[in-house]
């Protein structure tokens, strides 16, 4: 699996993990706002994954399955979490995503690099 495919795999797992965090946020006085942010972030991960997987298919790359993705990147357990823990996990995901976006640019056509940089900036 190349770095572009690893990015697609990471986006799939981040989507699922953000969904878990979204559903299991508890005991937060700012629950509504933080819950909405988590929803926005998992939507963004899903949309970026969809777009980049389709671009990868056009470049001749095979889509990583969720099973393959989970062999590389861990899924979170569906545990209730307070906002400080959720925020720490989320920021770690964002860091991992921005690093993987950087790696995915190697050997990728310029027109795709522009899209990767646009998406990377969003995180």
What are these regions (language model features)?
Residues 20, 53-55, 66, 72, ...:
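Weak global preference for isoleucine
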Residues 9, 30, 45-49, 67, ...:
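A sequence-composition feature that detects small, non-aromatic residues
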Residues 4-7, 31-34, 38, 83, ...:
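Amphipathic alpha-helical coiled-coil segments and their boundaries
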Residues 71-123:
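Acidic/histidine-rich alpha-helical segments that form the ligand environment
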Residues 33-67:
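Conserved alpha-helical segments that form or flank metal/cofactor-binding pockets of metalloenzymes
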Residues 14-40, 61, 100-112:
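Helix-loop segments that flank and shape redox-cofactor active sites
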Residues 1:
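Conserved phosphate-binding loops in nucleotide/dinucleotide-binding enzymes
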Residues 5, 9-12, 16-19, 39, ...:
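Generic structural signal for well-ordered, non-transmembrane alpha-helical segments
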């Amino acid at each position: 699996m190349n770095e572009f495919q690893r990015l697609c795999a990471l986006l799939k797992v981040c989507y699922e993990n953000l969904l878990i965090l979204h559903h299991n946020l508890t005991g937060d006085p700012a629950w509504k706002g933080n819950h909405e942010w988590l929803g926005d972030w998992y939507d963004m991960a899903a949309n970026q994954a969809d777009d980049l997987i389709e671009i990868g298919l056009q470049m001749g790359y095979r889509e990583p399955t969720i099973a393959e993705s989970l062999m590389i990147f861990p899924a979170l357990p569906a545990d209730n979490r307070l906002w400080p823990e959720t925020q720490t996990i989320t920021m770690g995901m964002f860091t991992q995503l921005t690093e993987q976006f950087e790696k995915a640019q190697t050997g990728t056509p310029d027109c795709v690099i522009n899209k990767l940089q646009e998406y990377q900036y969003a995180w």
